[in-house]
Amino acid sequence: LNFKEYAVINCSVEIAKKLNLYPGIINATLKKIAKNKNDLKQIKINFSDLPLWFQKKTSFMSYYEKKQFLENFHKEPNIHIVFKDEEKLKKFDAKLFKTSMISGFLLDDKNFQDRISFINGDWWVQDFSSFLPLYSFNKINKNKVILDACAAPGGKSFQILSKKLNVILNDKSKNRIQTLKTNLKRLKLSAKILNKDFIQFDNKSKYDIIIIDAPCSAVGTIRRNPEIFFKNKGPNFDKLLSLQENMLERASFLLNTSG
């Protein structure tokens, strides 16, 4: 995670003080961890160290697949970034492994938020797998009305807006909407924003294209979000599946005939 060490330590100590949970011990422990973090990176986990819910869900995997999973898990993920256009990528002054004419993996991703090009809104961070579906939409008529049903934090929406297309951004979460607005401001992009539950959308408005990046378990992003392993219970897969099915059904009523 890209948080400054001193900020993590100070924040943790302040919380410990409020909860009366040994702030002195927490302060000393975190400082020691920060000092020896390179040694900690050498520690390898076994599959049996992972939460029981995850082991059960992956019981179908072969020994080779589990071994491969652990090898990938221990690798630090590179940050994938997407540019507004080809010219901005050409002017980029850092090492980049290109994945398209407007995107690539940062090979030196330390403190990427401090780069002038990031501050100026030339690009945004977006997982490669999230980037691909919209990248394939090369030829979309500018008269098409597009709805991004679960827009925040905005990666897919930014791809569409960068092509000067008409897209309405929706998200159920007020907190995520705020993140979306912050990102739009930095990127100097604008769009109509809705804060609704997509399943409750009425049938009055119709759309030519509906993008659904539905809520999911996030298990596929474990390398970037290892905190998933620290939850007492795993994701409620049945509940998530039901939600995804309901969202797809809702979309079928909101799409134009040729959508």
Model-derived segments and spans:
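S-adenosylmethionine
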Residues: 1-259
